[in-house]
Each structure stands twice: as C-alpha cells, then as structure tokens.
Swiss-Prot record:
Accelerates the degradation of transcripts by removing pyrophosphate from the 5'-end of triphosphorylated RNA, leading to a more labile monophosphorylated state that can stimulate subsequent ribonuclease cleavage. The gene is rppH. One of its GO terms (molecular function) is pyrophosphatase activity. Its cofactor is a divalent metal cation. Transmembrane segments: none annotated. Its EC number is 3.6.1.-. Belongs to the Nudix hydrolase family. RppH subfamily. It comes from Verminephrobacter eiseniae (strain EF01-2). Residues 6-149 form the Nudix hydrolase domain. InterPro entries: Nudix_hydrolase (IPR020476), NUDIX_hydrolase-like_dom_sf (IPR015797), NUDIX_hydrolase_CS (IPR020084), NUDIX_hydrolase_dom (IPR000086), RppH (IPR022927). It comes from the Bacteria. This is RNA pyrophosphohydrolase. The keyword Hydrolase applies.
Amino acid sequence: MLDRDGFRPNVGIVLLNQKNQVFWGKRIRTHSWQFPQGGIDRGETPEQAMFRELHEEVGLLPDHVRVVARTRDWLRYEVPDRYVRRDARGHYKGQKQIWYLLQLVGHDWNLNLRATNHPEFDAWRWNDYWVPLDVVIEFKRSVYALALTELARYLPRHEPRNRYLRSGMRTRDGEHAGLFLTRVMSPKPGIQLPPGACFDPIPPTGMPDEREGLPFTAMPR
C-alpha cells in the first residue's frame, strides 16, 4: 500500500525502560541494530499497527507499555534502488513513518523475540537515549535523528540525568551526555553494538527472512 508519492505507511517504536534507556534490536542474521518498526496494513490506524508490531517483534502487549508521545507528522526516508525489487523500481520510493515513544511498565522478562515464527531480531540491548547511529543502516540514520530529537522533549522527567541529555551539558564526572547524533561513523567489520552493549544471540534456526509484502530484496524493515 503506497501513497501517491511512492511511500509506504509505517510505524517506528522508541521503547524506554524505567531508566529512560532505549531498546535496540539486532536485525536477525545481520550486523545492524535498529528500533522496532513495520508497515501499516490496510484498514489499520497507526496506533493499531504500532501495538501489532510491538507484539510481533518484541513480544509485548498493550498492558506492558505506556504510550508517552508520538511524532506530529510523517517522517520519510528513501530506499536506495539496490534494496528495491526491480519490478517496484520507479514507483516505490521508501517509507513514511509515525514514531511512538513508549515506556515499559512491565518487566524485561516480558520481552520475547520469538513471539512469531518469523522473528525480526536475534538479540536486544538497553542503551542510553543518545548514542551514535553508526550501527543503523545508512539510509535510516537521518529519520532516526529526527524522531529521537522530536520525542526527546517528552522523556519522563523522573530520571535525574535527563536534563543533561536534553541540554547537552556534562555530568559531574565530565562525561558528555548530550546530542551525539552528528558522530556517525563508518561501519567496522563484524558485529557492531551500540556503545557499551553486549548481546546473547539466539542460535540460528534456518527460518526464512519474511518481508511480508514489502518491495525489498535485502533491506531491514
């Protein structure tokens, strides 16, 4: 389902824990990390699609989260031709997204990367809200920066370090906790994690990597 400009409606999810750390998922059998996201099906509202994707990709139910905010307008990114099926080139341009900021009110053990038979992630990690975006596939980095920046104003204020994250000040120990979005580096060989991250991969099962109708060849959702 494309709009008249060739963009497919989509939702993205920035999921916080109680420390205002953000969920990152490692795209299955790849070296890239990303936030949960997925297409809006015909007849769905963006919020309905968000809750469906939340369960399909990370196993959470509506009762496990609190909706904090969403972006006001669609945020768009174009997909390079090499990631688009040949029969879709010329009329498919990319994705337009509504981004949601959610806070987990459940527990880490509620997360389940195998909630469906076609998992999107094989590892996950909580990380600081502002981290370099070099672990994100290149053509999504600008929309991630826009979404994080717009939603940052709604971060719950009970976490003491939020004021440093929003203002770009330094913490008492001298650690810079401000906007790192401009520090986007070239990917290095091997698995790249967000700074300070570690992961415990799920052993591969040989499952096919379904795209659920997306006109891509090898692109993360």
